Amino acid sequence: MASFNQSRIHNIEQLLKEGYSQMADLNLSLAAEAFPFECEACDCNEVYISSKNNNE
């Protein structure tokens, strides 16, 4: 019975590790999708501001 419980605990730990790993991967992919748009907007704004300053 003790070995069954140890095996069960080990399996639960493995499932938790895999679940946390998948959650981390998902968070990274969502962040990668979200932030480039903000960065592109910032880059466009910087280009606009710098070109406006150069024209003055």
Swiss-Prot record:
Domain of life: Bacteria
Keywords, alphabetical: Toxin-antitoxin system
UniProt GO BP: regulation of DNA-templated transcription
InterPro entries noted in UniProt: Arc_rbn_hlx_hlx (IPR013321), MazE (IPR048242)
Subunit structure and binding partners: Forms a complex with cognate toxin MazF which inhibits the endoribonuclease activity of MazF.
Its job: Antitoxin component of a type II toxin-antitoxin (TA) system. Labile antitoxin that binds to cognate MazF toxin and counteracts its endoribonuclease activity.
Similarity-based family: Belongs to the MazE/EndoAI family.
Name assigned to this protein: Antitoxin MazE
Taxonomic classification: Bacteria, Bacillati, Bacillota, Bacilli, Bacillales
